Every structure is written in structure tokens, then in C-alpha cells.
């Protein structure tokens, strides 16, 4: 795989969403000063690009707090449109510009009051006391009831004992298997103990049953697989500011990935034929699609395999998190805005991507989905289900949500370094030992910058 493909595929990994319109600036500079408008103060928000949820929150907040000015600074490598927005996917250059610009501002003691934390080196910011601990703000605010929210998501989004990046929604990460194919091959899966090596052997057995033109996952490339491995094991690969890539753990990861492509379980080529997949990535994006997936009789939902067969809880991911600059002079105003974004009213917005953090909102959405399932109008499933079956599946979803305890979060710069060096191992140019040492040295250099 040449460098152009490496960069192109990395861009696929960092793509999260397009953007929508809002009152955005050019990203010309940061702000930690207390700005005074005609009637109040100004909150500055730094983001790579405006998300629909942030856009709607700003517009609605201005109606109830006209005394607060909110300025959004977008940082994109490509030119912006007249309205400061773009419908294009984020590129690697966009991510690099955002990380570099915001990090430079934060290191100098400046920067925006609120920062979109996704893709930023959060652990570095926390180590240098650049972010405010949300738990402190919650404890000081008698109007905020944290019990209305999923505590396990808060707790597993922490750095140490503090919460420095506020999640507003989350997605459950899992995979699905074809029920009929698995039954025909007489395969039973214990997803609490299975490993990627076990997954490979199961896939090979299924291929013998249905044909060699099948693959475990369609359109899953080696660097995507590597990025997923790193995310799932990030706390072991970066432990208390120390890199652990020159280790048997990481070398075994690389060997597992290479063996799956060498043995034909996966193919590093694009295909439009998704009927030739044995398994599917099954991210549960929201209550309605989640219920559809667990109700589908053709599919069986599984936890992802692990490197060592040790189940550590359901993995989840938050695609939109916010931090508050510890140097901000409008921290109270920033917290009030974020608290508004966590309100039941805002969390009920259709632009929320994922399961809302507000438990009451999720309960209502699950109840609505249940009624649709019983009536036979649930999207993707053109059949009716009895209320008892639907309720049992809703309880399965609750178990997944309540068991979510592994935050799939990583420093994209670390992932980028690993991807750049990994290709030389996949192509046979370098040994797994040499590549792990190269990655270790480069990551350590980056960490110590």
C-alpha cells in the first residue's frame, strides 16, 4: 500500500460528520479574556467544524440568554464558504490544523473558553492542568442532578479521578453475525471470552461452509483494523504518559492483523458486494436503530473479540465532547451553556447523534420505538413483534448501556504514527520487532514534546 492510500484511508478513520451552519468566525485567534458585549459576556468555542447539535444549541441558547454572546471559531485546513461551513468530510489536514492551532493556544495560556475535544491530545491537556474538572462544577451547582445521566459513561470518560471532556451522547460498539450461517456451521460463540485469533478460526470455518469469496468483514482495511485495536487497548498502550508499543501486546496485535489478511479472512480491497460478509460492525447508534438490530431474527449481536480473551465491559464511543479551558474567565457562563446542552429539552433534539446522556430521553425514545415495533412500523424491520418480546430486547439494550465501561478514545497523533509505520510490516519490508520499536520511539518523542 503506497503512502497516498495510507493517507486516504487515515482520512476515512477521522471522518465523523459533515457540518452545518452557525455564527462562526475564521478561527483567527483564541480568547480567554472576559469579553463584554452591550449587555453581557462572550463565550468563545473552538471547533474543527460546526456540528448540527452545537449549531442548534447556540441558536436556542441565544434566545433564552440574549445577554450572552457565543462566538464559534472554526479551524479547517481548506477554505471555508461564505457562511463559514462545509459539507465535506474532515481530512487529515483539517485534523492536523485543528490540533496544532488549539494546542499552541492552550500551551500559551490562551485559547477558547470551550473546546471541542475530539481528536485533541486530551491526556496532555489534563497533565498540564489546561482543562477544568466537570465534577467540580457539578458539585458546586445545586441545580444539576448528575443522577439523571448515565454515570457509567461519565466515569469511563474520566482522566484519573476527573471528568475533563463532557460527553453529550454515545454509541455502543459491537458486531453482528448471520444467525443462519452460524447455525448451519454449528458454531456457538461466547463473546465474553473470544479472541481475535478465535474470530479468525470461526471465520475460516464459515468460509468453508459458504465459499472462499466470503470475508469476515467487507471493506475493512489493515490500517482501520489497527486503529480499532489501538482504540480498544489505548489504556494499555499509553499508560500514565508512557508508551508501551515495544511490547508483546502490540506485536501480537500486528501479527493477528497480518495473519487475517494473509490467510484470506480479510481482504485489503474495496467491494460493493456486502452480501459476501460473514460479520458486520454493528454500532448501536441510537435507541431506534439499536432496538431494530437486537430484534432482527437474522442477526445475532456480539461483543467485539479482544486480544487476550478478557472481557472488560461493553465498548462505547462519544463522537462529540467539550472541555472548558481552565484559564477561561467566563467559566460559569461556559458551564451554564454546557448544562443547557445536557438539558432534557436539548438532549431530545433529533440532531443528537447516538444515545443521549440523559436517561429520561433514552427511556422515552425506547418506549416510542417499542410502540413502533409492536405496530410493525419500526424502520428496517417490516414485521410486528409482540410486546413481551420487544420488552425483553429492550432489557438487553439496557444491559449493554449499563455495562458500557470501555471508552474507545485515543490520541489521533499516536494512531497516525502507528499507521505510518505499520505499512512497512504489512508489506514485509520490516519485521514486527523493528516496527514496534520505531513506533515506540516516535510516540515517546511526541509524548515528551
Enumerate the predicted regions with their spans:
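C-terminal capping/gating helix-and-loop segments adjacent to ligand/active sites or protein-protein/ligand interfaces
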Residues: 375-447
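Extracytoplasmic "Venus flytrap"/periplasmic binding protein-like
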Residues: 67-148, 185, 278-279
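C-terminal motif of bacterial Sec signal peptides marking the signal peptidase cleavage site
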Residues: 15-18
Amino acid at each position: 500500500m503506497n503512502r497516498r492510500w495510507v493517507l486516504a484511508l487515515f482520512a476515512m478513520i477521522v471522518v465523523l460528520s459533515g457540518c452545518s451552519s452557525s455564527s462562526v468566525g475564521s478561527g483567527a485567534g483564541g480568547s480567554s479574556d472576559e469579553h463584554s458585549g452591550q449587555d453581557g459576556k462572550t463565550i468563545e468555542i473552538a471547533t474543527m467544524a460546526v456540528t448540527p447539535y452545537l449549531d442548534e444549541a447556540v441558536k436556542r441558547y441565544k434566545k433564552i440568554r440574549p445577554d450572552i454572546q457565543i462566538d464559534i471559531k472554526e479551524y479547517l485546513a481548506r477554505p471555508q464558504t461564505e457562511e463559514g461551513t462545509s459539507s465535506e468530510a474532515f481530512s487529515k489536514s483539517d485534523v492536523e490544523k485543528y490540533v496544532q492551532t488549539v494546542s499552541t493556544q492552550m500551551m500559551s495560556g490562551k485559547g477558547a473558553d470551550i473546546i471541542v475535544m475530539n481528536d485533541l491530545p486530551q491526556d496532555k491537556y489534563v497533565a498540564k492542568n489546561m482543562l477544568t474538572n466537570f465534577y467540580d462544577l457539578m458539585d458546586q451547582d445545586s441545580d444539576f442532578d448528575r443522577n439523571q445521566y448515565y454515570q457509567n459513561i461519565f466515569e469511563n470518560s474520566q482522566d484519573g479521578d476527573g471528568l475533563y471532556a463532557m460527553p453529550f451522547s454515545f454509541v455502543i460498539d459491537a458486531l453482528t453475525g448471520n444467525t443462519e450461517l452460524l447455525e448451519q456451521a454449528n458454531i456457538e460463540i461466547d463473546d465474553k471470552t473470544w479472541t481475535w485469533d478465535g474470530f479468525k478460526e470461526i471465520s475460516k470455518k464459515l468460509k468453508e461452509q459458504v465459499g472462499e469469496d466470503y470475508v469476515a468483514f467487507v471493506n475493512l482495511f489493515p490500517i482501520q483494523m489497527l486503529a480499532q485495536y489501538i482504540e480498544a487497548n489505548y489504556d494499555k498502550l499509553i499508560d500514565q504518559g508512557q508508551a508501551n508499543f515495544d511490547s508483546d501486546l502490540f506485536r501480537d496485535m500486528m501479527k493477528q492483523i497480518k495473519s487475517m489478511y494473509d490467510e484470506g479472512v480479510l481482504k485489503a480491497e474495496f467491494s460493493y458486494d456486502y452480501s459476501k460478509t460473514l460479520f458486520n460492525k454493528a454500532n448501536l447508534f441510537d435507541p431506534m436503530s439499536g432496538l431494530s438490530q437486537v430484534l432482527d431474527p437474522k442477526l445475532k449481536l456480539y461483543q467485539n473479540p479482544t486480544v487476550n480473551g478478557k472481557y472488560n465491559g461493553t465498548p462505547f464511543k462519544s463522537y462529540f465532547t467539550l472541555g472548558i479551558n481552565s484559564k477561561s474567565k467566563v467559566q460559569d457562563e461556559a458551564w451554564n451553556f454546557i448544562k443547557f446542552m445536557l438539558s432534557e429539552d436539548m438532549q431530545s433534539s433529533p440532531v443528537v447523534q447516538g444515545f443521549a446522556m440523559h436517561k429520561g430521553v433514552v427511556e422515552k425514545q425506547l418506549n416510542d420505538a417499542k410502540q413502533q415495533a409492536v405496530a410493525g412500523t419500526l424502520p428496517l424491520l417490516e414485521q410486528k413483534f409482540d410486546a413481551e418480546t420487544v420488552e425483553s430486547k429492550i432489557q438487553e439494550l439496557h444491559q449493554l448501556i449499563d455495562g458500557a465501561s470501555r471508552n474507545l478514545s485515543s490520541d489521533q497523533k499516536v494512531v497516525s504514527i502507528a499507521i505510518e509505520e505499520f505499512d512497512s510490516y504489512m508489506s514485509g519490508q520490516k519485521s514486527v520487532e523493528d516496527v514496534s520499536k520505531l513506533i515506540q520511539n516516535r510516540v515517546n518523542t511526541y509524548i515528551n514534546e
